[in-house]
C-alpha cells in the first residue's frame, strides 16, 4: 500500500469520471482513514463537555494530541468596521492543544498538568470542553508513525444555548 498510494498516509483512493460532449475528465481523491471515531452527538445544547472516543486503525501509530478550536457564531459587522475593513479571522485565536495523559506522578512542565487525552490499548478518549459557550468547535487529531505528525481525523460540534 505504501508504494501504490502517494505518501503512504492515504488508505483509500476514489476515482471519478466526468464526461461532456468534447471532454473527458478523470479525477482522483486520496483519503486517509487513520481513526474510527465512535458515534457521538454533534449538535450540543448548553453542554459543558462531551466525551469523544476513537480507535486507531494503525496499531503502530501514536497519538500526538488534538488541536481544539473554537469559533463564535458570526455577528453582523457595524458600518464602521466594514468601512475600516476590520474583518475577524476565520479561525479565532481561541484554540488549545489537548495532550496525551502522562503516567501518575509525571506532569507537563509547561502547565503542571498530566494531560487531557486518556490513552487506551487501541485508541483514546477525551472529554472535550465547550468552555467558550455557544459556537462551533472543531477537533483535529494528530498522529505520528515515526516520521513526524500528521492530521489523521477531524470532528466538529455545534453548540447552541
Regions found by a protein language model. Give the residues of each.
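Signal-transducing coiled-coil/dimerization helices and immediately adjacent hinge/linker segments
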Residues: 81-82
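A well-ordered secondary-structure block
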Residues: 1-34, 58-77, 86-142
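Solvent-exposed, conformationally flexible loop/turn segments
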Residues: 44-49
Amino acid at each position: 500500500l505504501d508504494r501504490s498510494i502517494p505518501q503512504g498516509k492515504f488508505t483509500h483512493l476514489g476515482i471519478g469520471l466526468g464526461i461532456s460532449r468534447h471532454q473527458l475528465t478523470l479525477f482522483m481523491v486520496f483519503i486517509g482513514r487513520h481513526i474510527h471515531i465512535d458515534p457521538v452527538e454533534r449538535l450540543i445544547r448548553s453542554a459543558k463537555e462531551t466525551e469523544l472516543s476513537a480507535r486507531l486503525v494503525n496499531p503502530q501509530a501514536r497519538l500526538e494530541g488534538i488541536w481544539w478550536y473554537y469559533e463564535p457564531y458570526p455577528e453582523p459587522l457595524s458600518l464602521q468596521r466594514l468601512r475600516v475593513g476590520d474583518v475577524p479571522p476565520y479561525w479565532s485565536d481561541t484554540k488549545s492543544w489537548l495532550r496525551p495523559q502522562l503516567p501518575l506522578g509525571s506532569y507537563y512542565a509547561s502547565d503542571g498538568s498530566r494531560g487531557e487525552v486518556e490513552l487506551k490499548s487501541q485508541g483514546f478518549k477525551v472529554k472535550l470542553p465547550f468552555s467558550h459557550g455557544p459556537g462551533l468547535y472543531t477537533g483535529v487529531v494528530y498522529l505520528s508513525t515515526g516520521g513526524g505528525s500528521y492530521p489523521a481525523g477531524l470532528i466538529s460540534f455545534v453548540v447552541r444555548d
